């Protein structure tokens, strides 16, 4: 059984801790968590999940085989600079920090350590994340399998190349917000056409869940499934024509492309900042 350390104790760290402790054979007493100063937060994690907590880096990292980086991007340089003396080549670092490349992590710690970079989404909190991971050249097949198994406790895991993670961020990382935005519009339209709020909510949610399961279980393409619901001269066709007149499909494409571009811009900025700070040491 791996000894796991979490550097950072925010919502994503908690989602992973919840998944790992409830959906794997990992013992909570083999998980240690720390943050910079929030004792109340650590107390909640200890009480809720039975994990150990500390403010001592030696206690956190002694004998740890997997180190999860779960701090905010702006704190990565200072956190890694502080813990790098405790890191060694037998460890595996798993980063869930958005925008921070594996090269940047290697630059800060200046050691040949196995690194896996992960991009989950907020559905991790209910064990339904669409998570993409990328690995550096030092990761073994065994390490990859262990981390994949751990991350599968918060959802589905897909292995990609690191240069695809900006696209993953734009598509599935931000993806839940796009669906929530769609639901907002459906709720507003339900009110406009006179549907009861609670009834509308139930209908909307089940419609989305049902459509998602159809996509997951059917061999048919989304286009085929859509056309099967769209009878000539019918209600669905009338609605689709309005969406097409407003170029909704094109807007969604542009939305994801721009989110991807922004992820790349933010990542490049972070990399430059880390490089500059590293040169100053």
Please provide the spans of the model-predicted regions.
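Internal alpha-helical scaffold of NAD(P)-dependent oxidoreductase catalytic cores
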Residues: 104, 108-114, 130-167, 180-217
């Amino acid at each position: 059984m791996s000894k796991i350390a979490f550097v950072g104790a925010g919502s994503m760290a908690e989602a992973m801790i919840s998944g790992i402790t409830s959906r794997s054979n990992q013992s909570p007493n083999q998980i240690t968590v720390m943050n910079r100063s929030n004792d109340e937060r650590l107390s909640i994690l200890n009480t809720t999940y039975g994990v150990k907590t500390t403010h001592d880096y030696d206690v956190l990292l002694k004998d740890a085989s997997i180190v999860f980086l779960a701090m905010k991007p702006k704190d990565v340089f200072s956190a890694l600079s502080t813990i790098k003396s405790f890191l060694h080549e037998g460890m595996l670092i798993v980063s869930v920090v958005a925008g921070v490349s594996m090269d940047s992590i290697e630059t800060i710690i200046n050691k040949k350590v196995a690194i896996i970079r992960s991009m989950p989404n907020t559905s991790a909190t209910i064990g339904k994340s669409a998570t993409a991971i990328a690995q550096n050249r030092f990761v073994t097949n065994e390490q990859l399998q262990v981390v994949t198994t751990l991350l599968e406790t918060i959802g589905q895991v897909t292995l990609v190349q690191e240069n695809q993670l900006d696209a993953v961020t734009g598509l599935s990382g931000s993806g839940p917000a796009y669906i929530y935005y769609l639901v907002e519009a459906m709720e507003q339209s339900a009110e406009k056409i006179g549907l009861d709020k609670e009834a509308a909510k139930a209908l909307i949610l089940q419609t989305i869940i049902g459509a998602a399961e159809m996509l997951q279980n059917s061999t048919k393409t989304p286009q085929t499934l859509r056309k099967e619901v769209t009878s000539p001269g019918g209600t669905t066709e009338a609605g689709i024509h309005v969406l097409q007149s407003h170029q909704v499909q094109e807007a969604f494409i542009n939305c994801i492309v721009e989110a991807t571009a922004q992820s790349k811009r933010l990542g490049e900025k972070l990399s430059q900042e880390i490089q500059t700070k590293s040169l100053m040491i």
